[in-house]
From Swiss-Prot:
Family: Belongs to the FtsQ/DivIB family. DivIB subfamily.
Pfam families assigned: FtsQ_DivIB_C (PF03799), POTRA_1 (PF08478)
Compartments (UniProt record): Cell membrane
Record's bilayer topology term: Single-pass type II membrane protein
Originating gene: divIB
Species of origin: Clostridium botulinum (strain Hall / ATCC 3502 / NCTC 13319 / Type A)
Gene3D superfamilies for the chain: membrane protein fhac (3.10.20.310)
Job of this protein: Cell division protein that may be involved in stabilizing or promoting the assembly of the division complex.
Name assigned to this protein: Cell division protein DivIB
Listed transmembrane segments: 24-44
PROSITE patterns: POTRA
Occurrences of domain POTRA (ranges): 45-113
Length: 256
């Protein structure tokens, strides 16, 4: 009988303990709810500043406006996913990151695509990034220092999307060239890239045609060509060719 009394006492203690825990949990949830409500309501968490970083050509106000985030909005109500999608609609934007800095600051970091190529179709110039994204169509390209690009279906390509090509390899090859040309620090400035025949790729330096051949070892071929084009006898040449398309010593010819 004493055993039954002990077990009953223990049961009562356990039950009381559970009730206490339940009350504590309810109180904790209640306090959290109050805290969340305060965070969403009090002006302390209203956005006071929106900082834009990483932009080069796109004005800060354009990025800020396209995000649809306003100063005065509660920082916890801010929908980062929607803001990133809105900013990314600009073809010149390659990457967006948004960071909330409590209590009231927002930082938007963007990485821009850089214009490197162009092609003229009728009266419009297609502006192309180094990795083959169509950035825009415009009526003039004065002072933009772009490289003429051949070998793609420009009329079938959409702004904000990759160039259309009959051969899908062309976009990959263009991207490889884009990286190398963007990193070219020499005074050899190429004027045209011809990818119409991927077995006979050509790139031009003023009137001199550089025969690349296939896309194998593009970096090596391009560096070899640049070193040749830097020679004094080729700097003033108006017409000729440099052939680096095969293994062995390259050949060059200057038309007199």
């Amino acid at each position: 009988m004493s055993k039954d009394l002990i077990s009953t006492d223990e049961y009562i203690k356990i039950k009381k303990k559970r009730k206490r825990i339940k009350k504590i949990v309810v109180l904790f949830i209640f306090l959290i709810s109050i805290l969340v409500t305060l965070c969403l309501k009090i002006p302390y968490f209203n956005i006071e500043s929106i900082e834009i970083k990483g932009n080069v050509n796109i004005p800060k106000e354009v990025i800020k406006d396209s995000s649809t985030i306003k100063t005065g909005n509660n920082i916890f109500y801010t929908n980062k996913k929607d803001a990133i999608e809105n900013i990314s609609l600009n073809p010149y934007i390659e990457e967006v990151k948004i960071t909330k800095k409590l209590p009231n600051k927002l930082q938007i970091y963007v990485k821009e695509r850089e214009a490197l190529f162009y092609n003229k179709v009728d009266n419009d110039f297609f502006i192309i990034s180094k990795n083959g994204c169509v950035l825009e169509k415009r009526k003039e390209i004065k002072n933009m220092k772009l490289i003429n690009l051949q070998g793609f279906e420009f009329n079938e390509s959409k702004i904000g999307s990759a160039l259309k090509a009959k051969d899908e390899r062309a976009v990959k090859i263009l991207n490889d060239f884009g990286v190398l040309l963007k990193n070219n620090t020499s005074d050899v400035i190429f004027t045209q890239l011809d990818l119409r025949n991927l077995l006979d790729i050509k790139i031009y330096y003023n009137g001199i045609c550089v025969k690349i051949g296939t896309s194998d070892q593009i970096e090596k071929k391009l560096n070899t060509a640049i070193n040749i084009l830097k020679r004094d006898e080729l700097k003033k040449a108006k017409k000729g060719y440099v052939d680096v398309s095969y293994e062995g010593n390259p050949v060059f010819y200057i038309e007199k």
